[in-house]
A protein has these predicted regions:
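Alpha-helical propensity feature that highlights long, continuous alpha-helices across diverse contexts
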Residues: 1-117
C-alpha cells in the first residue's frame, strides 16, 4: 500500500513524535521534534512507515532489519554513541541483541502506522 506524499508525511510526523516520546520515557532525549529534525531523520521515518505498510509483521524484527540496512547504505556503523557527524550508532546490532524497550519501539512503529492509515 502506498500513500500520497502529504498523507505519508502526516503519518511519518505522528510516528516520529510518538517515537520521540517513547524514547524520552526511556531516557533518550536526543531526538528533536519533527519540525527541528534534519532531513535524514524525516527520510528515515518515512522509510519506516513505508516498510510497515508493505510488511504486516506484528513484531519489530523486519522493521529493525530495514532500519539497519538503511543506515548501512547511508554509511553508518556500530559505535558506542549515536553521532550523526561520525555516522555511528550503538543500536546497529542484530534484533535479538537490542534492549527490550528498543524491540518494543520497532513494533510500535508497525502498530502506529497501521492505526493511522
Amino acid at each position: 500500500m502506498s500513500l500520497p506524499p502529504d498523507h505519508l508525511d502526516a503519518v511519518a510526523r505522528t510516528v516520529h513524535e510518538a517515537l520521540r516520546a517513547w524514547a524520552a520515557a526511556h531516557g533518550q532525549r536526543d531526538i528533536p521534534a519533527w519540525d527541528e529534525a534534519p532531513d535524514w531523520m524525516h527520510a528515515s521515518t518515512r522509510e519506516s512507515v513505508r516498510h510497515a505498510l508493505e510488511h504486516d509483521a506484528p513484531d519489530g524484527r523486519t522493521q529493525h532489519d530495514q532500519w539497519l540496512s538503511q543506515k548501512a547504505r547511508d554509511g553508518w556503523t556500530l559505535g558506542p554513541v549515536k553521532d550523526a557527524a561520525a555516522k555511528t550508532h550503538p543500536l546497529m546490532v542484530p534484533y535479538d541483541d537490542l534492549p527490550e524497550w528498543e524491540r518494543r519501539k520497532d513494533a510500535l512503529i508497525n502498530a502506529l502506522t497501521r492505526a493511522l492509515v
